[in-house]
């Protein structure tokens, strides 16, 4: 149809002015599943302090097996370390400002205040997971015992390397934690050896496993110049593993350790909301965490088929 042809019916451009568009809520590309936060066991703390008491010297605790005679029984006691480590909750805070004119006029079909808070909370939770891994004070990578740090044999993460981690966290290991590129690199090494890893379904998603332990991806594990790390955790307080810490019963509580409080409206008609997220992490015993260092994710292999 040429531009000079007569119009015989209503056209699309004009018709769309009478139609309603179905609108999504704002999409945020940086949102991740945050598997680490889901898989950790979370412990409520009082007054924001968590003290990890430990036995001083287990080798000094003496017991005896009965010899069916009248020999004297040993006498013993369990001593504790004098200065146990205390973990303090860390806070992730921000203030969300929304102009009242915006929230009054443009909150249909999606509430502007709710969406502003939702997206802000998502960003804060992403930061929370990053801190659980990388924090200088309590992050996993900065709290691994020297004897629990393993180096790769040849750079690329091999089944032998992950076996070394399993040797160090052999008591009820829960999951490996690695950058997605590290998991892909491990998959390539398995394919090269002809031992494709099995898979398991968690939370409706599939994960590859090694020796029955799932490899959980997180883009918060550092990746620099093609090198990264792989972690292995045992989790839970009853297992003397790694536990997440949070403050319960917060004013304006919206979730575990999460608080949203209205701060008022200023003379510029800006409504302010204080959003706070309190959390930390504790490694209860040294053998609850091991790290594979110097993991090279840049190695690829060429396969020849006959």
From Swiss-Prot:
InterPro entries reported in the protein's UniProt record: Encap_f2a (IPR049822), SrpI-like (IPR045641)
Record-annotated site: May bind cargo: 262, 273
GO cellular component: encapsulin nanocompartment
SS bond list: none
Short name of one Pfam family: SrpI-like
The keyword Cell inner membrane belongs to this UniProt entry's keyword annotation: no
Gene inactivation effect: No growth phenotype of a single sprI or double srpI-cyd deletion mutant in the presence or absence of sulfur.
UniProt keyword terms in alphabetical order: Encapsulin nanocompartment, Plasmid
Site features described as 5-fold pore central residue, chain residue numbers: 192, 194, 196, 304
Upregulating conditions: Transcriptionally induced in the absence of sulfur, requires CysR for transcription. Part of the srpG-srpH-srpI operon. Present in when grown in sulfur-containing media, induced 7-fold after 48 hours of sulfur starvation (at protein level).
Coiled-coil intervals: none
Localization of this protein: Encapsulin nanocompartment
Entry domain remark: Has 4 domains; an N-terminal arm not found in the type 1 subfamily, a discontinuous peripheral domain (P), an elongated loop (E) and the discontinuous axial domain (A).
Subunit structure: The 24.5 nm encapsulin nanocompartment is formed by 60 subunits; monomers form pentamers which assemble to form shells. There are 12 positively charged pores where the pentamers meet with a minimal pore diameter of 3.7 Angstroms as well 3-fold axis channels and dimer channels.
Record-stated family: Belongs to the encapsulin family. Family 2A subfamily.
Function in brief: Shell component of a type 2A encapsulin nanocompartment. Expression in E.coli generates nanocompartments with an average diameter of 25 nm. They can be disassembled by treatment with 6M guanidine hydrochloride and reassembled with cargo. The nanocompartment is probably involved in sulfur metabolism. Probably allows passage of cysteine into its interior; during growth in light the physiological pH is 8-8.4, about 30-54% of free cysteine (charge -1) would be able to pass through the shell.
Protein name (record): Type 2A encapsulin shell protein SrpI
Gene encoding the protein: enc
